[in-house]
Amino acid sequence: MLAGILDFRSARMSLDSLLLSRLAPWRSSSAWWVAFSGGLDSTVLLHALTRLSERQALPVIRAIHVHHGLQAAGDDWPAHCQRVCDQLGVTLEIVRVRVVPGASLERAARDARYQAFSACVGEGELLLTGQHRDDQAETLLFRLLRGAGVRGLAAMPDVRSMGRGSLVRPLLEVSRAELEDYARANGLAWVEDPSNQQLEYSRNFLRRQVLPLLQQRWPRAASSLARTAALMAEAQHLLDELAQQDLAAAQAGSDCRWLNLPSLALAPLRELTSARQRNALRHWLAGLTLAPDENHWAGWECLRDAKPDATPRWRLEGGELQRSGERVWWLPDGWLASVGGPVDWPDPSVELQLPGNGSLRLEGAPPIGRLQIRYRSGGEVMAVSGRGRRDLKRLLNEAVVPAFARKRLPLLYCNGELVAVANLPQLSAGRCALNWCAPGC
């Protein structure tokens, strides 16, 4: 945490020291991008970094300004940002985005902003944002009031991956008052977003009404809340480590890895307490969907406790979990869509692209005749070496192919006769093998 800032020299040296410490792991990066709104936080960050680069060997400093076009006052901000960058000798990238309103305009604008950042930041490059200690305290309070768990109460991480690079928040230990002191000491000008005065937004209400009241009674409230967020981040790190240990056995052993779908074995998970099961699943689902809140875990219990021949489903954002035998599988919405009809394959030496269903390659000597890819409709039979003609449904049961995958499993027909099933070499007539690269997540 920065000590009290008394004059220009001490302010500069304190902020320099903090930035050098926080950004040391990325000194070899090709570029540091500052997310430059023109507001106080990003103005101080950009100024401090450019002045620091005059005395230290740093990556090239660039700035990016995202213009949402949501309010008339904001139309002047790109020009302001350009003037500041011209004065500092910094290249500025101005990106104009269209915000699609949804349930939350704030969230839609933030999503559009970070999509623009991700597109701009190159491989191994850094995006630096100016959120400070008061922002962290505000975020913790906001999430606490929404009933967040440990991950949510960890508030904003100081580092996370973003696109091809990383996002770093180097000012989370600095208060807004300290940033204002620095800005005034250096004669900096910044813009004020008029929407920050509108108390109908929950964050503004916390910032303007709640936090000042708390700080009247407890002057170090923001510092204490930010410290709690840091402790929650540490606790979440431990929970993540525990989840990785608990998932290690559950993620092994699938007979159908060629499906390119995440799956878990149920037996290792059943050995865990309910709390550890939920922790492991939160960690596993984090990269796939929005984690369910504490009131929506009944879907998991249905999957876990169903009979082996049942096919329960747990619907989540962007897909669903399905059970097949003693495993649960994540199926994104694309997997749940229906596949098309038959596809002719005039030249089996060329990889065949299946509409919405991956691709096929034929290895070995292809059957002679008209080749066509079809999908199950029921009642299929095929000749199996040494076993005569067998019902396809029974053959797929023997191969332990999950029920949800069977409607997508490509079937190779030659002159109207089923001769091969994708990725199941035991179900292939002749000397060919049908290799299917299934669509992934």
Label for each model-derived stretch:
Residues 2-11, 15-40, 68, 97-99, ...:
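AMP-forming adenylation/ATP pyrophosphatase catalytic core
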Residues 75, 103, 200, 204, ...:
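Non-catalytic, surface-exposed connector residues within folded enzymatic/regulatory domains
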Residues 211, 215, 219-222, 226-229, ...:
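Short amphipathic alpha-helical segments with heptad-repeat character
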